[in-house]
Curated annotation (Swiss-Prot):
Cystine residue pairs: none
PROSITE patterns reported in the protein's UniProt record: FBOX (PS50181)
Name of a matching Pfam family: F-box
Domain of life the protein comes from: Eukaryota
Official protein name in the record: Putative F-box protein At2g33705
Annotated source species: Arabidopsis thaliana (Mouse-ear cress)
Amino acid sequence: MMKTRACSNPMNEGVNLEQIPYDLVLEILLKLSAKSIARFRCVSKLWDSTFRSRYFTELLFIISSSMQI
């Protein structure tokens, strides 16, 4: 059996992701490429449901269609 070792990341200490406003998270996620969105759906159930939500897909469509001028 392979042993795994927990990595201590100083960037994660003291940071509670629930404290980040959802709108800010959406703004960041909307800047991702389609390839990254497809890959990041596996991060968590919350991210998967966010990427699949009608609200997110409509925002993504509006942003992408406004950039193709």
